[in-house]
Swiss-Prot record:
Lineage, opening ranks: Bacteria, Pseudomonadati, Pseudomonadota, Alphaproteobacteria, Hyphomicrobiales
Name of the protein: Phosphoribosyl-AMP cyclohydrolase
Pfam families (alphabetical): PRA-CH
Residues the entry annotates as binding Mg(2+): 87, 89, 91
Family listed: Belongs to the PRA-CH family.
Enzyme class name: hydrolase
Database matches in NCBIfam families: PRK00051.1 (NF000768)
Native source organism of the sequence: Nitrobacter winogradskyi (strain ATCC 25391 / DSM 10237 / CIP 104748 / NCIMB 11846 / Nb-255)
GO MF entries: magnesium ion binding; phosphoribosyl-AMP cyclohydrolase activity; zinc ion binding
Length: 145
């Protein structure tokens, strides 16, 4: 999947040649294929990309655990990939998924469940939006641990 390439090849060519960062990762944005809602942002290494393409399930690389993981392997909240796109310089991918249940480890449909809003004075605050929990993370992750 990797290799040297010219700017023209990267931007206009048809070869998938991801541009991994110094840590060997690309950013992945996952959206709901039906609604277009952003579900989560994560990272993929070369193996996660390969497994995602080969299996049709979303695979990611955990920077904190330094390990591959298949979305839903602990929670059962699987992401089936319907389409994968790459950006112009191939350093990020966008996957349109069929989400089963919640995408966020907090039990919510999306990891983007808080809006940033202007607070009193010059302050900035967060406000919950679409924050309903679809599962209790304490129950799900304790049972799998």
């Amino acid at each position: 999947m990797s290799g040297s390439k010219s700017s023209s090849e990267t931007e206009e060519g048809l070869a998938f040649q991801p541009s991994f960062d110094a840590s060997g990762l690309v950013t992945c944005v996952a959206t709901d294929a039906k609604t277009g809602d952003v579900l989560m942002v994560a990272h993929m290494n070369e193996e996660a990309l390969r497994r995602t393409v080969e299996t049709g399930d979303a695979w990611y690389y955990s920077r904190s655990r330094k390990a591959l993981w298949r979305k839903g392997e602990s929670s059962g909240q699987v992401q089936r990939v319907l389409e994968m796109r790459t950006d112009c310089d191939q350093d990020a991918v966008w996957i349109k998924v069929e989400q089963q249940g919640a995408a966020c480890h907090t039990g919510r449909r999306s990891c983007f469940y808080r809006a940033v809003a202007k607070g009193e004075g010059a302050g900035i605050r967060l406000a919950f939006v679409d924050a309903e929990r679809l599962f209790d993370p304490a129950e799900v992750y304790r049972a799998k641990a």
